[in-house]
Swiss-Prot record:
Keywords for the protein's UniProt record, in alphabetical order: Cytoplasm, Elongation factor, GTP-binding, Nucleotide-binding, Protein biosynthesis
UniProt keyword annotation of Cell cycle present: no
Pfam families, alphabetized: EFG_C, EFG_III, EFG_IV, GTP_EFTU, GTP_EFTU_D2
Entries under PROSITE patterns matching the protein: G_TR_1, G_TR_2
Domain tr-type G: start-end pairs: 8-291
Biological source species: Prosthecochloris aestuarii (strain DSM 271 / SK 413)
Highest rank taxon of the organism: Bacteria
GO CC terms of this entry: cytoplasm
Protein's recorded name: Elongation factor G
Signal sequence segment: none
């Protein structure tokens, strides 16, 4: 199957936004206009094509990034009439699903950032924006819901500038706002566009309304000044009264967007079909193709040398698995982005992250949750493979003869856990397997068992995250389960470096056990996890026993010395030891490693850590005092407050343990008029009195 369009005519984009900015509706309209949908779905009635899981339809929020593909021919400018393929990844807007946003941004080349014209920049917009900055994703902004009462395009542009530190540059301004929203002034062509009142998908071009002429001129100069950073000649021509062609403006707008110096900003109302076609034109015109993004970097799995792959079909195949999903009809789907080369259905690839070979069964392109079989995929494509057994999110897939490992994805640790138990014997048989499948799909979801109680524990990024997963157990896997109260995922760490000897000796005639290790244990920067350094010289411990020492340490890390919580952020250096020709074994060194680590931690000022959450509450002014007082009573630290869209916002850092059931309290305190968002910030040392209480509670539990 030959390429349908050249690589320079491919756009891999995401649509990123706050939870209610109208993301799914906008994607629906895109698919409708690009000819992939016959009937437009509405999120209000649970009929939207992109929201394809039962829970998404019910809650009206998007949970799984569905990947879809469509084609578009711009109607103006340099790309006019040229067919382009747009691959879209719909990303969720709720903070509990930040991992979905993170992994989609990793494989995108550009993004459309959606803002609500009434709400402006909301808390999740900031989170998603920071994630996009991390990957240097060029963006176009689309101010949606211009037809709503209270819509204010210019106020939203101002909030993008102030709250996100971005440089939004309007390439359109609205004709009317709220119920009077009738169309836009196109600042590139200096023409008015008036949408049909009944069906916004049709419009007519008119002269710029008389009362908007001076405003349109002001914003056109603003646009030319903004792009002059990339090309000064354009502004000079304008100021000297010379004619500037449309194509000149478009070319420089594209350069400035790709350089990340500006965010071209448009407006519309997706629900009323107004503005989506112009947004599609801008996606093609301003966002990068894989050719613009250039080579992808990686390293050789054996030699560690740096390697680059060119985005070409002729280059060796390299791709990144960014999502695992279970499809009710075809089973496990591995979504991946092809960075270079061509991959054929039925061929073999190397998973260079694990070193295992995998056979590609079928190759599918997804249109939301509908499938289309492909015989091959090319550089720049986003597709799904069926039949891959051991590929996980973030693994590199590549040509066996030319191995490469692309940069890995890093996911946050879960912060909340609950006990889960099956309702019946039949459920009991299916629970383990079903949870394993869910954990395979979602790197921030963990399953473990409490050795003391035998309970199964599930951990995730928030209450909603776990609620949705328990719901999926019921719907997709037909497993009924009871869940306990949410528990905080506490951690332990150390504050100083110490040396310690770990010794395991059992010698009383016959085959004994002998292992002795000298360890240096020191604290690591937060979030670094565990680092093991083998500093053994002169073979004082044979090489084959060294991995066993590390395994013993990692076993011991699961159960901290203060209250039995996992230990994190430690570096362990094995620098000396002894072995016995006959009695030493892997088991002896594993136990010695474990004993040595536990002893070291006891001396290294161990402390208990708890997850600290970033909380933002938006409330009517009359409840501000109550909200702040309540946050302070929850050990919260108020970090800032201000005015937003006629309401007050409060930013605070609050321990997760104090936030359970907060939504109910907030609702009753503000008569349902306030709302809040919460996301994990970092682990933080627990105050002494609370640490002692936790210690006692744990001792009592162990005594039982």
């Amino acid at each position: 199957m030959a390429r349908q369009v050249g690589l320079d005519k491919v756009r891999n984009i995401g649509i990123m936004a706050h939870i209610d900015a109208g993301k799914t509706t906008t994607t629906e309209r895109i698919l409708y206009y690009t000819g992939r949908l016959h009937k437009m779905g509405e999120v209000h009635d649970g009929g939207a094509t992109m929201d394809w899981m039962e829970q998404e339809k019910e809650r009206g929020i998007t949970i799984t990034s569905a990947a879809t593909t469509c084609f578009w021919e711009p109607r103006y400018g340099i790309y006019k009439g040229k067919n382009h393929r747009i691959n879209i990844i719909d990303t969720p807007g709720h903070v509990d699903f930040t991992v979905e946003v993170e992994r989609s941004l990793r494989v995108l080349d550009g993004a459309v950032a959606l803002f609500c014209a009434v709400g402006g920049v909301e808390p999740q917009s900031e989170t998603v924006w920071r994630q996009a900055n991390k990957y240097n994703v060029p963006r176009v902004a689309y101010v949606n819901k211009m037809d709503r009462v209270g819509a204010d395009f210019f106020e939203t542009v101002k909030s993008i500038k102030e709250r996100l530190g971005a440089n939004p540059v309007p390439v359109q301004i609205p004709i009317g706002q709220g119920e009077m929203f009738a169309g836009v002034v196109d600042l590139i062509r200096m023409k008015g566009i008036i949408y049909d009142k009944e069906d916004g998908s049709t419009y007519e071009e008119v002269a710029i309304p008389h009362d908007l002429e001076s405003e349109a001129k002001h914003w056109r100069i603003n646009m030319l000044e903004a792009v002059s950073e990339v090309d000064e000649t354009l502004l000079e021509k304008y100021l000297e009264g010379e004619d500037i062609t449309e194509d000149e403006v478009r070319k420089v707008l594209r350069q400035a967007t790709l350089a990340g110096t500006i965010i071209p900003t448009l407006c519309g109302s997706s629900f009323k079909n107004k503005g989506v076609q112009f947004m599609l034109d801008t996606v093609v015109e301003c966002l990068p193709s894989p050719v613009d993004v250039g080579n992808v970097a990686g390293h050789h799995p054996d030699t560690d040398e740096d390697i680059v792959r060119e985005p070409k079909d002729e280059a060796p195949f390299a791709g990144l698995a960014f999502k695992i999903a279970t499809d009710p009809f075809v089973g496990k789907l591995t979504f991946f982005r092809v960075y270079s080369g061509v991959l054929k259905a039925g061929s073999y690839i190397l998973n260079s992250t694990t070193g295992k070979k995998e056979r590609i069964g079928r190759l599918l392109q997804m249109h939301s949750n509908k499938r289309e079989d492909l015989t091959e995929v090319h550089a720049g494509d986003i597709a799904a493979a069926v039949g891959m057994k051991d590929v996980k999110t973030g693994d590199t897939m590549c040509d066996e003869a030319k191995p490469i490992i692309l940069e890995k994805m890093v996911f946050p640790e879960p912060v909340i856990q609950i006990a889960i138990e099956p309702k019946t014997k039949a459920d009991s048989d299916k629970l383990g397997m079903s949870l394993a499948k869910l954990a395979e799909e979602d790197p921030t979801f963990r399953v473990s068992s409490d050795e003391e109680t035998g309970q199964t524990l599930i951990a995730g990024m928030g209450e909603l995250h776990l609620e949705v997963l328990v719901d999926r157990l019921k719907r997709e896997f037909k497993v009924e389960a009871n869940v306990g109260q949410p528990q905080v995922a506490y951690r332990e760490t150390i504050k100083k470096a110490v040396d310690h000897e770990g010794k395991f000796v059992r010698q009383s005639g016959g085959k004994g056990q002998f292992g002795l290790v000298n360890l240096k244990v020191e604290p690591l920067e937060q979030g670094k996890g565990y680092e093991f350094v083998d500093a053994i010289k002169g073979g004082v411990i044979p090489k084959e026993y060294i991995p066993a020492v590390s395994n013993g340490i990692q076993e011991a890390m699961k159960d901290g010395v203060i209250a039995g919580y996992p230990v994190q952020d430690v570096k362990v250096t094995l620098y000396d030891g002894k072995y016995h020709d006959v009695d030493s074994s892997e088991m002896a060194f594993k136990i010695a490693g474990s004993i040595g680590f536990k002893g070291a931690v006891r001396k290294a000022d161990p402390v208990l850590l708890e997850p600290l959450m970033k909380v933002e509450v938006i409330t009517p002014e009359e409840y501000l005092g109550d909200v702040m007082g309540d946050l302070s009573s929850r050990r919260g630290h108020i970090e800032g407050m201000g005015d937003r869209a006629g309401a007050q916002f409060v930013k605070a850092k609050v321990p997760l343990s104090e936030m359970f059931g907060y939504s109910t309290v907030l609702r009753s305190m503000t008569q349902g008029r306030a709302n809040y968002t919460m996301e994990f910030e970092q682990y933080h040392e627990v105050p002494k009195n609370i640490a002692e209480a936790l210690q006692e509670k744990n001792s009592a539990k162990n005594a039982d």
